[in-house]
Amino acid sequence: MESVLNNEKAIVVFSGGQDSTTCLFYAKKHFKEVELVTFNYGQRHDTEIEVAKQIAQDQGMKHHVLDMSLLSQLTPNALTQHDMEITNNEDGIPNTFVPARNLLFLSFAGALAYQIGAKHIITGVCETDFSGYPDCRDSFIKSMNVTLSLAMDKDFVIHTPLMWLNKAETWKLSDELEVLDYIRTKTLTCYNGIIGDGCGECPACHLRQRGLNQYLESKGAL
């Protein structure tokens, strides 16, 4: 299967974070041609867009940045509101959840894939370290794959290489791709906008660091 994929084109939904950057290198390994798409939806930190641009430049990859600022107008959430504290809502879903974000992102990624002739769409969503985001579920992705293909009469394939990996396993994958140190130092996962190991205090940093420690312990590197 890999040899077939190597002759095809893919687009990666790319934020400059650990997961999507791991997907970038996964795509580079498995596809002949890869482009990136980043969505500017009014994130708390402009740094996220700049990090994505820098990584794309480092890797010499064509990078599309699309304006999705409408998202921040639809609903208040801690990913777009600078003065909102990050907490869990009554239903257990963190207030970092942006309703319909992945629905819209994959729709626009599909439209772009159609225009550039890419059959494959790669996204870093994951159920294993599940924050409660309903649009990260495997069932949603499978449904979206069918919807995009029907909507544009194209046989798209949405790939989720991290879907069943926990954070330690995601670090393992990056190590197998020989980019662990690059991802550790160059990506932005921190909700407080600090590149690399981050602030060490926010939920995203805790999850990332715990996974890294677990992986390094498993290989005897700590």
From Swiss-Prot:
Catalysed reaction equations from the record: 7-carboxy-7-deazaguanine + NH4(+) + ATP = 7-cyano-7-deazaguanine + ADP + phosphate + H2O + H(+)
Enzyme Commission designation: 6.3.4.20
Pfam families, sorted: QueC
Membership in a protein family: Belongs to the QueC family.
Role played: Catalyzes the ATP-dependent conversion of 7-carboxy-7-deazaguanine (CDG) to 7-cyano-7-deazaguanine (preQ(0)).
Cofactor comment text: Binds 1 zinc ion per subunit.
Required co-factors: Zn(2+)
Organism field: Staphylococcus aureus (strain NCTC 8325 / PS 47)
Any one Gene Ontology BP term: queuosine biosynthetic process
Organism domain of life: Bacteria
Positions contributing to ATP binding: 14-24
Alphabetized SUPFAM superfamilies for the sequence: Adenine nucleotide alpha hydrolases-like
Cited PANTHER family: 7-CYANO-7-DEAZAGUANINE SYNTHASE
Pathway assigned in UniProt: Purine metabolism; 7-cyano-7-deazaguanine biosynthesis
Annotated Gene3D superfamilies: HUPs
Enzyme kind, highest EC tier: ligase
The protein's name in its UniProt record: 7-cyano-7-deazaguanine synthase
Keyword Zinc: yes
Disulfide bonds: none
Protein keywords: ATP-binding, Ligase, Metal-binding, Nucleotide-binding, Queuosine biosynthesis, Zinc
CDD domains: QueC-like
